[in-house]
Amino acid sequence: MVTFEYRFDVLPGKLKEYEKYSKGAGKDIWLKFKGVKAVRVYKSMLGGSSPQRLVQVDLESLAALETILTDPGFRKVKVVFHGLVTHVSDSLLTQVSDKRK
C-alpha cells in the first residue's frame, strides 16, 4: 500500500467556489476509482497557517495511482481544482511504523 498526500491553500476569494467544488465535481472523486482504500481530508485548526488543507489517499499500488492520474475524467476535475487552490505540493508515502496506545 502507498499513500498519496497532497497539501494546498485555497486561493483568496475562492473559498465559496472551493466549497461548491468539494460538494460537487470534487466530492468523493478518489473513491470512484478501483484501488483506492481510504481518503482522509484535514483542515488546519490554526486558520491562517499553510497549508490550509491536506488530503491523504491510501492506494493498493502505484499502478492504481497512475491509472487515476491519467483518467480523462479525473484530469478534467483536477483542472478545476487547480483553478481554486495554490501552494500545491505532494508526496508519495509508505508506512514504516504504526504504534498505538
Q: Which sequence ranges carry the predicted segments?
A:
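Short amphipathic alpha-helical segments
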Residues: 14-41, 73-81
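Non-catalytic surface loops within mature trypsin-like serine protease
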Residues: 10-12, 59-61, 94-98
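Short, well-ordered beta-strand segments in beta-rich or mixed alpha/beta enzyme
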Residues: 2-9, 40-72
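Glycine-rich beta-strand-turn "strand-cap" elements at beta-sheet edges
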Residues: 37-54, 77-101
